[in-house]
A protein has these predicted regions:
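Short, glycine-anchored, charge-dense loop/turn motifs used at functional sites
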Residues: 38, 60, 139-155
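Short, internal strand/loop/helix patches
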Residues: 106-143, 148-149
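Structural microenvironment flanking redox-active thiols in thiol-disulfide oxidoreductases
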Residues: 64-112, 123-128
Length: 155
């Protein structure tokens, strides 16, 4: 009986830890996440603007493809020139693949030639979980009304 109760409790608890999957046309989840310098950035900061959220992992071969070809930097430049807010998000936990410490962020992105609005450090993964970001580069485009109009891969 004790085993059955434990099994039931675990079964009921699993959905509580599942990631949310954001659907197109749904409101974008609010966030407030700090960059490497400690400055907080939020979705509310970009209210009334287009926003791109780009999940980044320096060791991901698909991220490498887009950064080594300068594709991602070109998109950042093009759309930011049109007033888009571009947040690059690092959700890698300390010591895990793709992790960048605060002191490593600026040199890494200078080397990449990338100039997003800000690089957000989501080491606890809360923002990634709120958006359901599972891979890199995982992209979300949010319209000025705060709705997700694209969610998925860049290719």
């Amino acid at each position: 009986m004790k085993t059955l109760v434990t099994l039931l409790a675990l079964t009921l608890a699993i959905p509580a830890f599942a990631q949310t999957e954001i659907k197109v046309d749904s409101p974008a989840p609010a966030f407030s996440v700090k960059d490497a310098s400690g400055k907080a950035h939020s979705l509310a900061d970009a209210k009334g603007k287009w926003v791109v959220l780009e999940w980044y992992n320096k060791d991901c071969p698909y991220v490498r493809k887009h950064y080594d070809s300068k594709n991602m930097q070109g998109l950042q430049t093009k759309y930011m020139a049109q007033g888009v807010t571009w947040y690059t998000v690092i959700s890698s936990a300390t010591g895990k693949q793709g992790f960048l410490g605060n002191a490593d962020v600026a040199p890494n992105f200078t080397k990449e030639g990338a100039k997003p609005t800000a690089v957000l450090i989501d080491t606890d993964g809360a923002m990634g979980k709120a958006y359901g970001a599972k891979t890199t580069p995982h992209m979300y485009v949010i319209n000025p009304e705060g709705k997700v109009v694209y969610a998925g891969a860049i290719d």
